[in-house]
Amino acid sequence: MVKRPRVPTLPPKEALILELLLQEKEMYGLQLVAASRKRLKRGTVYVTLGRMEEKGYILSRLEPAPPDAGGLPRRVYEATPFGRRALAAWTHMARQLVPELAR
């Protein structure tokens, strides 16, 4: 069972990942690194994704490798409704703390 905090905590990297997933619906790890313009590093993105999945912010599934690419299946990530709410709460809080963000 996923443990869900009463007040979601959302470190900046997790907020960035949720923003990217909401823009694209679903992505795999290396797509997130590329879309973040290197703000996410290959070495930490999968640790962060695992932590986010434990918190219930995202879900993942294995997707078969494309036939032309060969290789291993890829893990694809998508935001959950709980993750969307956590991001909305985080964004609201950030705008309260820094009014310039509301513009």
Please tell me what each predicted stretch does.
Residues M1-V2, F82-R103:
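Amphipathic alpha-helical dimerization/coiled-coil segments
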Residues R4-V7, P64-P66:
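Short beta-strand/turn micro-motifs at beta-sheet edges
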Residues V7-Y46:
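N-terminal helix-turn-helix DNA-binding core of bacterial DNA-binding proteins
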Residues T9, G50, P67-A69:
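Short secondary-structure boundary/capping segments
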Residues V45-K55:
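Basic amphipathic alpha-helical segments that dock to polyanions
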Residues K55-G70, E78:
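Beta-hairpin "wing" of winged helix-turn-helix
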